[in-house]
Regions:
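Mid-to-C-terminal Rossmann-like scaffold of FAD/NAD(P)H-dependent oxidoreductases
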Residues: 1, 7-8, 283-396, 427-431, ...
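A Rossmann-like FAD-binding core segment of flavoenzymes
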Residues: 25-27, 66-69, 75-96, 103, ...
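Glycine-rich dinucleotide-binding loop and its adjacent helix/turn
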Residues: 110-172, 208, 261, 266-268, ...
């Protein structure tokens, strides 16, 4: 069987290698526009920041090494320019000479990836304006950074790559400004209150962020000097554009392959609407594992999973892709973030009845060296108790919380299914009740009516108006609020009316919950706890 693979980075090389492992009698050819294949695109920001020192470390396999390792034939510098499904041929050209060659196939896999979206603004082609996609891009950025001539940089785009670039520029003594046109960072993967908390941490670390701003132009005499926006101008010695990507699928316009906004539609087997043509990676749609709807997941993990599955399906195994959850983790200055599943906003849009909770919980035994906290937002459907999503912020291993959630959501588990799991515990690693389980317990308490709260989003929206703030911290911490020492509450509290609306606030939320439990026992009927306490919320008493 002759299999032609268009694209040789993540999905393409995975398909090709797996095909040859399945059956070495296959003839598998990879056509790749660039000279590098199988490079670490997700590692590019860390090369800029000297976390990865040698550029060779970014190249997982050279074409020569890959060919010897797999038996796949690799043609670099070869760009596919036309596909003719009725003839089962692909026309490709040599990017250096322009010479065209016709390739035949029995099966075709399209894995041509994406390119940065180039905004239609003045000055985008000035010197020292960069995009980040290939090792060559990262090398050019680092070469400029290493001259010591860059003092200020503007990063356009507050997604994962943009923020990782900003962190690594900051580590090299550069002051980065991050701009984004949407109202929050890390959109749409995080609910706004979680994103805003992370933004505050970035600002504390010396990375100013401006959201809701449109970049309108770039000025400079030959090279960038200033970035113009809808609000103000920013001086800059460098600009890194990270404000979106577009699939490299223009050459497929007349093929009959179904697409959505340039992204190839596939079924659960990785097939397009045309027989014997498959698609994977950043140029292809997959589906959301919760909603079943088409989803775009331009992630290296998705590309590799889909590529491996397609290789097996070409061999006739009939394996269906479970779908994606938008799972992601990101390292930022002093804080890591992770997420999977639906946000609360997305869950509402999809017709669920979402209920959520935000906890601040120890990430390991509090007495163990290096112990810190996780801030975990857990979202479930109130009626079915099905787990829908998790978002995590913390200085430690946020990925382990995310990965537990991924497992549960993928299996369509309910909170009851996931309760009381025998998760790993030892003081250096976790807490006796795992942070995931702790948050699940709190959410179940809330659903069952044992924990009445305002979420941070509800509090910020003014829903606690009319409630009197009560300081339930370990020691007085909220100016202007009456202080109540939890351990001394053994009856009605002087100065607090049992009929009064009381908002109980502590450092993290747990102590306020315990206070609520006692006050309820002594006849207080209208108490609410502010989830995540003053660790997460700005609480002021008028």
């Amino acid at each position: 069987m002759k299999v032609l693979v268009l694209g040789g980075v993540a999905a393409g090389t995975k398909v090709a290698a797996k095909l040859m492992r399945e059956d070495r009698s296959n003839e598998v050819i990879v056509l790749n526009k660039g000279e590098n294949i199988s490079y670490a695109g997700c590692g590019l920001p860390y090369y800029v920041g000297h976390v990865i020192e040698e550029k060779e470390q970014l190249i997982v396999n050279t074409p020569e090494k890959y060919e010897k390792l797999t038996g796949v034939k690799v043609h670099t510098g070869t760009e596919a320019i036309a596909v003719k499904p009725e003839e089962k041929t692909v026309v490709a050209k040599d990017v250096n000479t322009g010479e065209e060659t016709i390739y035949t196939y029995d099966k075709l896999v399209i894995a041509v990836g994406e390119s940065p979206a180039k905004p239609p603004i003045e000055g985008v082609d000035l010197e020292n304006v960069f995009f980040v996609r290939t090792p060559e891009d990262a090398i050019r950025i680092r070469n400029l950074v290493d001259t010591g001539n860059v003092k200020k940089a503007v990063v356009v785009g507050a997604g994962y790559i943009g923020l990782e670039i900003a962190e690594n520029l900051k580590s090299q003594g550069i002051r980065p400004f991050v701009l984004d046109m949407v109202p929050q960072i890390l959109a749409p993967g995080f609910d706004k209150e979680m994103a805003d908390y992370v933004e505050g941490k970035l600002v504390e670390a010396g990375i100013p962020v401006v959201t809701g701003v449109q970049v309108t132009g770039i000025e400079g005499d030959g090279k960038v000097e200033k970035v113009l926006t809808s609000k103000k101008a920013y001086k800059a010695d460098m600009v890194v554009m990270s404000a979106g990507i577009r699939p490299n699928t223009a050459f497929l316009a007349d093929t009959g392959i179904e697409m959505f906004k340039g992204t190839i539609l596939t079924d659960t087997f990785g097939q397009t609407n045309i027989p014997d043509i498959y698609a994977a990676g950043d140029c292809a749609m997959v589906h959301n594992a919760i909603t079943g709807k088409a989803a775009w997941s331009p992630m290296g993990s998705t590309a590799n999973i889909a590529g491996r599955l397609i290789a097996q399906n070409i061999r006739g195994k009939g394996l269906e892709y479970r779908g994606v959850l938008g799972t992601a983790v990101c390292k930022l200055p002093g804080v890591n973030v992770g997420r999977t599943g639906l946000t609360e906003v997305q869950a509402k849009e999809e017709g669920f009845q979402p209920v959520s909770v935000i906890t601040v919980v120890d990430d390991k035994a509090h007495y163990y060296a290096g112990a810190s906290t996780f801030i975990i937002k857990m979202i479930a459907d109130k009626e079915s108790l099905r787990l829908l999503g998790v978002q995590v912020i913390g200085s430690g291993a946020v990925d382990k919380i995310v990965d537990i959630a991924v497992t549960g959501i993928t299996m369509k588990a309910t909170l009851t299914d996931l309760a009381d799991m025998d998760l790993a515990y030892a003081p250096p690693f976790s807490t006796a009740i795992h942070p995931f389980e702790h948050t699940l317990n709190v959410l179940m308490n809330k659903i069952q009516g044992n924990f009445e709260t305002f979420t941070p989003a509800e509090y910020a929206a003014g829903e606690a108006e009319g409630y009197r703030v009560v300081d339930g911290c370990l020691k007085p911490s909220i100016e202007g609020a009456p202080y109540v020492e939890l351990t001394e509450v053994d009856g009605p509290v002087d100065g607090l009316d049992p009929e009064e609306k009381l908002l109980l606030v502590c450092n993290k939320g747990k102590r306020a919950y315990l206070l609520q439990n006692r006050l309820k026992f002594y006849g207080y009927k209208h108490t609410k706890v502010l989830e995540a306490g003053i660790t997460f919320n700005d609480v002021e008493v008028e």
